[in-house]
């Protein structure tokens, strides 16, 4: 079982429900992250401003990596508090977070993906990109 954990209350609730209802013994806790340099380049490219090519020397120096590591550790702590053995995975997102989660699920050969959702409906859901929705549509695996 792969738990897509981003540190939100929704992700924590999804982990708690999965522990109660699916009763796994071991879970793969996955936190997907995007380097700050890539986030900045994507944001700046929309404005037409010249993009800098400066990037940190190593992953460990990237503040986004440090934050993702902290979040993943919180997921492991939550899993252990629920009586589960958790294995931590950090995945750098090259395209979208949903693609990173799906690729990791296939690589880890899990049988189900657990993810939280914002449960948007109506007009807001139509205009808002949903990671959970993309996972459901493209994973080829059960999603809880």
Task: Identify the meaning behind each predicted range.
Residues 70, 77-113:
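Structural beta-alpha unit
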Residues 8, 35, 106, 118-121:
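Short glycine-rich anion-binding loops that position phosphate/pyrophosphate groups of nucleotides
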Residues 61, 65-76:
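Short, surface-exposed alpha-helical segments at coil->helix boundaries
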């Amino acid at each position: 079982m792969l738990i897509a954990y981003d540190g939100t209350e929704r992700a924590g609730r999804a982990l708690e429900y999965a522990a109660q209802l699916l009763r796994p013994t071991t879970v793969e806790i996955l936190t997907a992250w995007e380097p700050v340099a890539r986030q900045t380049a994507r944001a700046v490219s929309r404005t037409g401003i010249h993009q800098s090519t400066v990037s940190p020397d190593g992953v460990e120096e990237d503040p986004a990596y440090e934050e993702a590591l902290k979040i993943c550790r919180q997921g492991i702590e939550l899993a252990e508090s629920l009586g589960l053995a958790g294995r931590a995975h950090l995945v750098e997102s090259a395209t979208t977070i949903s693609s990173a989660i799906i690729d990791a699920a296939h690589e880890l050969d899990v049988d189900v993906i657990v993810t939280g959702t914002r449960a948007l409906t109506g007009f807001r859901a139509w205009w808002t990109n949903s990671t959970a929705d993309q996972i459901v549509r493209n994973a080829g695996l059960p999603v809880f």
